[in-house]
């Protein structure tokens, strides 16, 4: 088995999918898991990007079906901007599409800035823009877990195969969640699910961005990665990509393994 095939298997990628069937499977997963845990529903941060829009709509479909079956669950969508988000219109369009039971908004700027200032005062150095970006991601997850803990809700994560293969997420930030309904999907497959669900094309054709950096607001994921999502998707779907691209992907996969594992102990061997 080639490394490409090993990665596809590890990340549960299917080269070809039926979008309607995938929606059904993922809604069923959300329903089954929340019933098994006895939780009262879900909470998810909504950015206005493809991934949170898709995960949010799946979550709302799941809770509606459970209620129709006699259950009592809810879904809270959370906006978590740092000050004013440049693409706030897209976030609002996503919320309209998702139709969550409840939507709330937390501006994380005061919390992030207070921490950054205290860090500088205590350690006599400023946080780099990159590390401050990770603080933003982690404060967003703290907020979601506070809501989840208070109301008995599960935190949904938006990680999918094209992020997992590169480790392109913040450890214990957007990488922290209770369940991952998008696991195994490539970026283009997620786009196909949103099309099947009837989303406005603005929500799945927009340029993907983590938007965590003050110095480079709205920087494209592809710019930061040095790899396009089409290349990632082709690789993950078993297609041939240029050798240098495959090498980049495989290197990122190897060095980011710690992000896909629980914290290492002396009894683990994945890190050796």
UniProtKB/Swiss-Prot annotation:
CDD domains: NAD_synthase. SUPFAM superfamilies: Adenine nucleotide alpha hydrolases-like (SSF52402). Deamido-NAD(+) binds at residues 138, 171, 178, 258-259. Transmembrane segments: none annotated. Keywords: ATP-binding, Ligase, Magnesium, Metal-binding, NAD, Nucleotide-binding. It catalyses: deamido-NAD(+) + NH4(+) + ATP = AMP + diphosphate + NAD(+) + H(+). InterPro entries: NAD/GMP_synthase (IPR022310), NAD_synthase (IPR003694), NH(3)-dep_NAD(+)_synth (IPR022926), Rossmann-like_a/b/a_fold (IPR014729). Pathway: Cofactor biosynthesis; NAD(+) biosynthesis; NAD(+) from deamido-NAD(+) (ammonia route): step 1/1. GO terms for cellular component: cytoplasm. The keyword Magnesium applies. GO terms for biological process: NAD biosynthetic process. It is an enzyme of class 6 (ligase). ATP binds at residues 45-52, 158, 187, 209. GO terms for molecular function: ATP binding; glutaminase activity; metal ion binding; NAD+ synthase (glutamine-hydrolyzing) activity; NAD+ synthase activity. Mg(2+) binds at residues 51, 163. Pfam families: NAD_synthase. Its EC number is 6.3.1.5. It comes from the Bacteria. Belongs to the NAD synthetase family. Homodimer. Catalyzes the ATP-dependent amidation of deamido-NAD to form NAD. Uses ammonia as a nitrogen source. This is NH(3)-dependent NAD(+) synthetase. It comes from Bacillus cereus (strain 03BB102).
